[in-house]
Amino acid sequence: MDLITPDFGIIFWQTITLLFVLFILGKFGWKPILQTLKKRETHIEEALKGAEEAKQLLAQLKSEQEKLLEKSNREREKIISDAVATKNDILETAQMEARQLSDKVLKEAREVINTEKEIAFGKLKHEIFLISVQVAEKLLEKELNTENKQEELVRRLIKETHLN
């Protein structure tokens, strides 16, 4: 047991050595160690502040990105609606022009048909007139082949003209 319990001299010298080591550490070691710890603590705080600022910046950028996305979506919808409106206007204009052209062509066709119809009726009347004259000529030749009949017709025509 003697080996386990230290002597008074050993305790004394160990205490002196410990105090000397503490003095040396206090004089030369603690200040650099504390400064290093302080620097590390400051560095960690700055890193945390930087991380927080980065987080805020990221949130701000995300918010701006969402706003830009919304704006671009609105612009896209506006462009699409404008394009649809323009398409509808163009289609409506084209349909109206097609209708006008169709009406114009129909009107011209009707005019041509009416003109040709009038020409055909004129030719038909002329043909009927010529046929009537030929028939009348043939009838008159048959009826007026004698001189008595010719004189009788002339007298009758004179009487009718005086009466009218």
UniProtKB/Swiss-Prot annotation:
Location of this chain's protein in the cell: Cell membrane
Subcellular location, principal: membrane
TM ranges: 8-28
GO molecular function, one term: proton-transporting ATP synthase activity, rotational mechanism
UniProt topology in membrane: Single-pass membrane protein
InterPro entries registered for this protein in UniProt: ATP_synth_B-like_membr_sf, ATP_synth_b/b'su_bac/chlpt, ATP_synth_F0_bsu_bac, ATP_synthase_B_chain
Keywords tagged on the record: ATP synthesis, Cell membrane, CF(0), Hydrogen ion transport, Ion transport, Membrane, Transmembrane, Transmembrane helix, Transport
GO cellular component annotations of the record: plasma membrane; proton-transporting ATP synthase complex
HAMAP family recorded: ATP_synth_b_bprime
Family membership noted in the UniProt record: Belongs to the ATPase B chain family.
Name by which UniProt lists this protein: ATP synthase subunit b
Taxonomic source organism: Amoebophilus asiaticus (strain 5a2)
Organism phylogeny: Bacteria, Pseudomonadati, Bacteroidota, Cytophagia, Cytophagales
Encoding gene per record: atpF
